[in-house]
Each structure stands twice: as C-alpha cells, then as structure tokens.
C-alpha cells in the first residue's frame, strides 16, 4: 500500500485527538464547572456535562448508518469527513469566545463540536480498508491510535504550560490561557487534517451519482443492509458485544477528569494524569497489537475488557493522587489497544464496498452506548449529592455504577 496514504490517514488521528484530550477529557469539564457553570454545585455541572455528551452521542448514533449508506453510494466519505471536521473545528474555536456564566451556550457549542468530532470519525474509520490490506490493517489501525495519543499528549502538555504559566505566553491569566487552549485545538485539528484531504484516495464502488440520487439509493441500501445484517451473524454478534463493552471505555474517557475534580484533586494533578495516559497509550497501543496478533484479536479484546473491569473496580477505591495515577497508568495500557483491535477486527468482517455504512452501524452502537454511560454517571452524582454529605463517597459510587465493559 502507498505509505503516503497510510501516514496521511493516520495523521488525522494526530489531528483530532487534540479535541479528545484537551477539550473532551481535559479542560472543558473543569472550565465548564468553574467558569461557565456554577462552581458551588459540582453535581449539577456533572449532570449537565453528562447530558451534553449523551445528546451529542444520540444525534450521531441516529445519523451514522444512514449517512454511511449515502457516502458509500456516492463516494462521499471524504466529503462528509471534511464537513463534520469543519463543524467540529469551527465549534471548538468558538469555545474560546464564550463569556463567563454562559453555560447554556458553552454546552450547546460543545455538543456541536462533539458531533463534528464523532461524525468525522465515522468516515475516517471507513477509509481504513482503503489505505490498508489484510496483512497490515491491524498495524495501520494501531498506528492511527498511537499517533493520536502522541499528538494529543504533545498539545495538552503545551496547553497545560499555557494555563500554568500564562505570563510566559503573553497571556493575562489562566482563564485567557484556557480559551486560547481551545483555539489552539481548532488550529491543530485543521492543520493536521490537510494531508488526509490531499493524499488519501477514496475508491469508487458505484457509478457517479448526484447527491439527491445518492440519498435515495443510500436509504434503500440502508434498509437492505439492515435486513442483511440479521443474516450476517458474525457482524451482528460483534456489534452487540461492542455495544456492551465500549460504553465503559467511552464513559471513562469522557468523564474521568470530572470524576477526579469531584474527588478534590487539583487541575495540575488531573492534567498530569491525562498526559501520563497519552504517553503510556502511545507505546502500549503499538505493543498491544503485537500481543493481540500473537494471542488472536478476539482474545486481545477479552484482555482489554478484563483490564477495564479492573480499572473500574480500582476507581471505586481511589483516595489519593497516587491511587489516581495508578488508575491512569492502567487506562493508558488498555485504552488504545481495545479501540484499535475493535476497529481492525471489524474491518476484516465487513464488505469494503459498504465500509462507510457498516462503520455507521459500528459508530451508531458505540454512540448509543455513550448515551447511557455519561448521563447515568451525571444522574448518579446529582442524586447521591442530595442524600450523601460526603462528596467523595458520591463520586466513588457514580464511577462504580457506570456501566462497566462486558462481553
């Protein structure tokens, strides 16, 4: 396969992972609670943050398979990717211009930025079979995730330094630095998306169609594929299992920083843990794929599920920053591996000519899973904070009761 296309494709993970680290997992949850929302009521902030994540996931889940079918019919994978990436980039830039106390606007902009991020990932994933073959698809998938962790880790370190030492960057205070951190994510995302847009070629499996014809034929294809899915037992079984275990993974990714903040850890400690996850995950993902190739991809997923069960169990007992860093280390060991193997295994069992549509179903179930975890986490926090005086105990319970990875 063309190495330029492989690295151009993988570099998009480097580009958009800045949103996942700096915005989604890092600064937005804390900034939303302390600047845009009410800093005296963390439980309410957690609830609205979980609700926002769930709304974004639900919208993407409903659109994913239909847009995937349309993209397959009209060879619109790259076009749809660019559209959603543009939406995410613009909304992320917009986070840097929202005034204090404007939590409804901040939440709405965050929802749209998350839709852009998640929507683009559908079509990014669907291009994986186009830039790889049966021999290297596992390594290419792992390369994307590992570069994502490295790129996200580099930018969050820069952003953390900006917020910790704003004067050195010519900024007034940490608030201004945080807003510029959001802007830097948008710029980073846009800049490193360019190679994919220029060098990754999208194969055509159908005759060229107008957008209107692609919509009509795509809807017909979606209906037919949905019916055929009942006959494809391997794909259907995998999707069901994926729906069950990815919820735990997504909930930990999206809500870990807010969980740590609720436990009373300071921002520096939380950011240090996020950087640790990124750096460990960069190496762990590349190693994990080698282990999975040795023991089998299916067993590799089982190993990741077991790892996340241990992580969630350990999270219940977190009391000190040392405990939190141990949990962060464990997350880094398993997070990228289970995501990468899931993607590459799924690519092996679906027809390439319908990759966008099938990845639509893949992302639909992933997003439906992400609907329940964050909103359950926020709801449990809100409920327990009203009946338990010890905020730390409430935080422990909400993590433990969020859906854990299962098979």
Predicted regions and their residues:
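Structural signature of the two symmetry-related core transmembrane helices
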Residues: 79-93, 300-313
């Amino acid at each position: 396969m063309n190495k330029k296309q492989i690295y151009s494709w993988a570099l998009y993970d480097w580009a958009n992972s800045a949103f996942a680290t700096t915005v989604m997992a890092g600064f937005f949850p804390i900034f939303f609670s302390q600047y845009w929302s009410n800093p005296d009521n963390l439980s309410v902030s957690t609830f609205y943050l979980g609700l926002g994540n769930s709304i974004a996931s639900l919208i993407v889940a409903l659109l994913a398979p239909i847009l995937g079918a349309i993209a397959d019919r009209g060879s619109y994978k790259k076009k749809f990717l660019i559209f959603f990436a543009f939406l995410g980039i613009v909304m992320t830039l917009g986070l840097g211009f929202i005034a204090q106390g404007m939590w409804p606007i901040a939440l709405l902009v965050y929802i749209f930025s998350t839709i852009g991020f998640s929507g683009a990932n559908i079509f990014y994933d669907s291009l994986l079979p186009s830039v790889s073959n049966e021999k290297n698809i596992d390594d290419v998938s792992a390369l994307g995730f590992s570069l994502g962790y490295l790129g996200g880790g580099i930018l969050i370190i820069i952003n953390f330094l900006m917020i910790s030492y704003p004067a050195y960057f010519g900024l007034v205070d940490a608030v201004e630095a945080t807003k510029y951190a959001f802007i830097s994510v948008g710029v980073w995302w846009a800049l490193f998306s360019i190679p994919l847009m220029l060098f990754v070629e999208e194969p055509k499996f159908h005759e060229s169609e107008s957008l209107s014809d692609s919509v009509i034929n795509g809807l017909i294809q979606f209906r037919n594929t949905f019916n055929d899915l009942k006959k494809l037992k391997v794909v259907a079984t995998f999707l069901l299992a994926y729906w069950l275990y990815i919820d735990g993974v997504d909930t930990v990714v999206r809500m870990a920083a807010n969980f740590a903040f609720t436990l009373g850890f300071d921002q520096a400690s939380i950011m240090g843990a996020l950087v640790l996850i990124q750096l460990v995950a960069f190496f762990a993902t590349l190693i994990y794929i080698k282990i999975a190739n040795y023991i089998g991809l299916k067993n590799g997923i089982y190993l990741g599920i077991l790892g996340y069960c241990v992580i969630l169990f350990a999270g219940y007992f977190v009391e000190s920053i040392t405990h939190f860093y141990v949990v962060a280390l464990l997350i880094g060991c398993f997070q990228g591996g289970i995501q990468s193997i899931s993607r590459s295994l799924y690519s092996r069992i679906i027809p390439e000519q319908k990759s966008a549509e099938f990845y639509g179903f893949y992302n639909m179930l992933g997003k439906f899973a992400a609907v329940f975890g964050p909103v359950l986490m926020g709801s449990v926090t809100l409920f327990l904070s009203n009946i338990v005086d010890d905020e730390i105990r409430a935080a422990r319970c909400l993590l433990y009761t969020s859906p854990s990875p299962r098979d």
